[in-house]
Amino acid sequence: MKVKYIKYDETQCFSSTVIRYLNKDQKIAPFINQFPDLAAFKNIIKNRNFTGDRSILVDILLQQYQNIENQPEAIKANISYLKSNKTFTITTGHQLNIFTGPLYFVFKIVTTINLAKDLKKKFPEHNFVPVYWMATEDHDFEEINHTYLAGKKITWKKGRLSAVVAPVPSGLPDP
């Protein structure tokens, strides 16, 4: 099978800001904490200063998971790890948009799990718990009611009830 690597900027699917971030452009360095690489994780671990009460989070998670049957041991272990100040979460999330589909969710989740495993190998004295956060209620409809396709903005102008109730589209044909 022939495989060709396509650079992000060649896809014309990412903003110039995203391209600069991925290319570690020093012009944007003042606006971010760290570029994503192993050296950055070493600095983050070294400079962490979180002092919150972890037991509150652990207790709530244990309550939420108590009625789930046949839980994998990894879930129980990860919740337990959160008690320790030697534990970090590796968090990803997703805000709804039109062109990602279910495979993108799976990709993000698997990538986060793999990063947590890789960091555990690199920093064995720490634990890394993968967290997937579904950004379903943190946005305004105006943030997700449009997309760009072939240089044109396509907007869904009607049909918003609330962040937690599905919008009812008007003017669209029945399936």
Task: Locate predicted features.
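N-terminal targeting/trafficking signals and adjacent low-complexity tails
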Residues: 1-175
